[in-house]
């Protein structure tokens, strides 16, 4: 059985890794000329790359500010309807983007945020995924530390900052990786909510493949992969620990 599982996982690994390897190899089809054209002659690359960085970093940081208090409330607070509200969060997490993107567009249009950076950031701030994951992880934290801090202060914010967040470092790293990757890979939002090319992201650059030659496109795809791969390499241990502890709960 173990050998069968090993074979299955090996096949799946090859299926997932093969497109990445093919992209890297194709990026060197013309030697370094494609990278040279991309980095020195393609003037839209740098603005779109930094737009992707800014959107992903800002959304990730703001999501953490929202996620941690929400997850703390679900795990520690007692109020009527908490279970139903948490189920609602899970339903929202499973809801596909295509269901919510039109209401988001209408709301942003009415607020005058179409073709504005906030039109990308605001709809991504309130993500139920991080709340659900961090709530599961909070079931494993040491409540004795929280109770000891509550004896010293009545401030729930201080309790959260001094007693809860230090125990969430592993989970925070895991959530950061997932949220950053999700924001980095977003395509529909910048394509629909932004008209100004100077505000669009690198994912849009790659999606509009018909506008560029293969010499530039494949190197751009490799550059697009690098930030998420680096994050995974740095936070791999924290990601595995976070997923394991969340699964055990």
Language-model segments: what does each one mean?
Residues 2-249:
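A structural signal for multi-pass alpha-helical bundles of membrane permease subunits
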């Amino acid at each position: 059985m173990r050998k069968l599982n090993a074979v299955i996982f090996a096949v799946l690994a090859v299926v997932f890794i093969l497109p990445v390897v093919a992209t890297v190899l194709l990026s060197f089809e013309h030697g370094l000329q494609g990278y040279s054209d991309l980095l020195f002659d393609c003037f839209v690359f740098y603005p779109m790359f930094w737009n992707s960085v800014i959107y992903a970093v800002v959304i990730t940081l703001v999501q953490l500010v929202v996620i941690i208090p929400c997850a703390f409330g679900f795990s520690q607070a007692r109020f009527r309807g908490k279970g139903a509200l948490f189920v609602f969060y899970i339903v929202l997490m499973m809801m596909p983007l295509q269901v919510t993107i039109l209401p988001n567009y209408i709301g942003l249009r009415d607020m005058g945020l179409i073709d504005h950076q906030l039109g990308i950031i605001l709809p991504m701030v309130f993500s139920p995924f991080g709340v659900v994951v961090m709530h599961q992880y909070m079931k494993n934290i040491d409540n004795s530390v929280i109770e000891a801090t509550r004896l010293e202060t009545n401030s729930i914010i201080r309790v959260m900052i001094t007693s809860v967040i230090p125990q969430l470092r592993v989970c925070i790293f895991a959530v950061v990786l997932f949220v950053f990757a999700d924001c980095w890979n977003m395509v529909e939002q910048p394509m629909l909510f932004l008209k100004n090319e100077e505000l669009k992201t690198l994912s849009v650059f790659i999606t509009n493949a018909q506008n560029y030659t293969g010499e530039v496109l494949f190197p751009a795809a490799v550059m697009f992969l690098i930030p998420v791969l680096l994050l995974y390499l740095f936070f791999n241990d924290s990601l595995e620990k976070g997923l394991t502890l969340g699964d055990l709960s």
